[in-house]
Amino acid sequence: MIIPIKKIILESLQDKIKHKVIVYGEAHFHRDEVDRIRNDIIKLKPDIIIHELPEDYKFYKIHLPSTRFYQLERGLDQNIYKYFKGDYKKQFEIREKNMLRNIDFVLSDGLVKMPPKVVAIVVGDTHLRTIDTPELGPKSPFYNRDYIIIRSKYKEIKWLFQLRR
């Protein structure tokens, strides 16, 4: 039986390499929050940045040119908003599963190329909710991982519900 080399490498490295993964919850529409997170990430100098907003790529390429940048929602079918119009619970479930799948892919790909020691992830703070809600479903699946999570001071989920009233 022939075992692919990538599988052998991944299996041998999994026990030895531990990533320090820091997830920032961002209130996207608060400029001070965006700037604070950007400054934190620049100081952190992570090996990889995984970001929900692809437009931040240009900023990080200027300030951290050797850091690898990945889009968090790569491969997401944008039609979910049409298929599940108004069903935020289903939209969030699909999006968050896709996000975690992309994170797993990036980390496993990184193991083969160059093991990342520090990974920064930026996601809307609502995706880091600590409570179940009828509108958005169960608490965030990000808490099922061994990640350091830094929430927004604005607690975007509260802000989201205020908008709807």
Question: Where in the sequence are the language-model features?
Answer:
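Compositional signal for N-terminal targeting/processing segments
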Residues: 1-165
